[in-house]
Swiss-Prot record:
Organism field: Kluyveromyces lactis (strain ATCC 8585 / CBS 2359 / DSM 70799 / NBRC 1267 / NRRL Y-1140 / WM37)
Pfam families found in the cross-reference section: CAF1C_H4-bd, WD40
Subcellular locations according to the entry: Cytoplasm; Nucleus
Site location (Important for interaction with HAT1): 272
Function, in words: Regulatory subunit of the histone acetylase B (HAT-B) complex. The complex acetylates 'Lys-12' of histone H4 which is required for telomeric silencing.
Protease found in the keyword field: no
Self-association and partners: Component of the HAT-B complex composed of at least HAT1 and HAT2. The HAT-B complex binds to histone H4 tail.
Top-rank taxon: Eukaryota
Gene3D superfamilies: YVTN repeat-like/Quinoprotein amine dehydrogenase
Gene: HAT2
SUPFAM superfamilies hit by this protein: WD40 repeat-like
Protein name: Histone acetyltransferase type B subunit 2
Length: 408
């Protein structure tokens, strides 16, 4: 009798995680995983002085990050500042140790985050962002759409927010400080509104401007990195809109078939914009010709929820999503030739996939001090800090004739 082959069973999430753990020594120079008491919907590295200190004969560099809480109705919520002490070889760009030595070293790294400061917070922290021009000033957004401002310079133990701003009527996830104008803060809400605040004037509780151009939930808002008056928003109304604070009307509007959840402006090219959302693809756009994408990248298997360009590497874009994955994209590899075996692993621009999370990724952040050092939080209370191995993270280099805005 002919034997009937049984269909291959799909890999479980825990089996995928175990496989990822087994590959950590080959793929990473550093991995730290911490189970938080409560989930954090947000995470962002804080700019921290690069001054190593000696602890038990070892040089350690402390880095700090923002997280929040999403608790039950009976438990208080907090904005928290966490810290991790990293070995000097993790924070440098020196070549990695050999694989055998590194495997032993990784197995003994037990760096865990410590909560060094916390602020009482009304309702859950949906987003937390520091002001680039004054990093001790931190803004948050809560489940009612209220914006809070905190000041780390105030040392009282139980000190709360120094100001709150109310305009939105519903929850929100869009929050962004202007990188070029001090004190300008954008917030976006599920009620379809976007507000611009001047946080340097805490006595004024009204928005400087409001933008009511969307007809559904506003999923994200981001400032342009070079032009101080430009910002973008994406919404469940299937539009991406470019705004100018000098105008009362949208200056560009793109309608798409599937809603975008997130967008990001390039930190190197003033015309390059990325957006992604419910169809799982990441799209690249030229602001001068917004109606047609330059390129789309497939790699995620579910909605993409966060996008960020690297602050260090030109052409490096990172995305995360509900598929539990974080993908680094090397835009300079778009269109590169592939061997058939390589094509099985994804498109040529898919540089690295971080598969260490076992539930949807809420948010991630690039460290502005240490190239390639990342942090990420997931729905199931886990915070990971990780750095890909130096041997695989050569800085992306464009071909001499490469122009991202000529892609079709």
């Amino acid at each position: 009798m002919t034997e009937v082959e049984e269909p291959e069973q799909p890999t479980t999430i825990n089996e995928e995680y175990d496989l990822w753990v087994s590959n950590v020594p080959m793929m990473y120079d550093f991995v730290s995983e911490t189970r938080l008491t409560w989930p954090s919907l947000t995470v962002q590295w804080l700019p921290t002085e690069m001054q190593p200190r000696e602890v038990d004969g070892q040089q350690l560099l402390r880095q700090e990050l923002l997280i929040g809480t999403l608790t039950t109705d009976n438990e208080p919520n907090y904005l928290k500042i966490a810290a991790i002490d990293l070995p000097e070889n993790v924070t440098s760009s020196k070549p990695s140790v050999s694989d055998d030595a590194k495997e032993n070293e990784l197995s003994h790294r037990q760096s865990k985050i410590k909560i060094v400061r916390k602020f009482k917070h009304e309702q859950e922290v949906t987003r937390a962002r520091y002001m680039p021009q004054s990093p001790n000033i931190i803004a948050t957004l809560n489940g009612a759409g209220i914006v809070y401002i905190f000041d780390r310079n105030i040392k009282e133990k139980d000190h709360g927010a120094i100001a709150s701003f109310s305009y939105h009527k519903e929850n929100g996830y869009g929050l962004a400080f202007n990188p070029t104008v001090s004190g300008q803060l954008l917030s976006a809400s599920d009620d379809g509104t976007v507000a611009l605040w001047d946080v340097t004037s805490t006595a004024n509780k009204s928005p400087s401007q409001t933008f009511d151009v969307h007809t559904d939930i506003v999923n994200d808002c981001k400032w342009h990195e070079f032009q101080s008056s430009l910002f973008g928003t994406v919404s469940e109304d299937n539009t991406l809109i470019i705004h100018d604070t000098n105008s009362d009307r949208a200056i560009q509007k793109l309608s798409v078939s599937s809603a975008f959840n997130t967008l990001a402006f390039s930190k190197r090219s003033e015309n390059l914009l990325a957006a992604a959302g419910t169809d799982s693809n990441v799209y690249l756009y030229d602001l001068r010709r917004l109606q047609k994408p330059l390129h789309s990248m497939a790699g995620h298997e579910d909605s993409v929820t966060s996008l960020e360009f690297s602050p260090h590497q030109d052409g490096l874009l990172t995305s995360s999503g509900s598929d539990r994955r974080i993908i680094m994209w090397d835009l300079f590899n778009i269109g590169a030739e592939q061997q058939p075996d390589d094509a099985y692993d994804g498109v040529p621009e898919l540089f690295m996939m971080h598969g260490g999370h076992r539930s949807p990724v809420n948010e991630f952040s690039h460290n502005s001090n240490v190239p390639w050092l990342m942090c990420s939080v997931e729905e199931e209370n886990v915070l990971q800090i990780w750095k890909p191995a130096n041997k695989i993270v050569r800085p992306p280099q464009p071909p001499a004739d490469f122009d991202i805005t000529t892609l079709e």
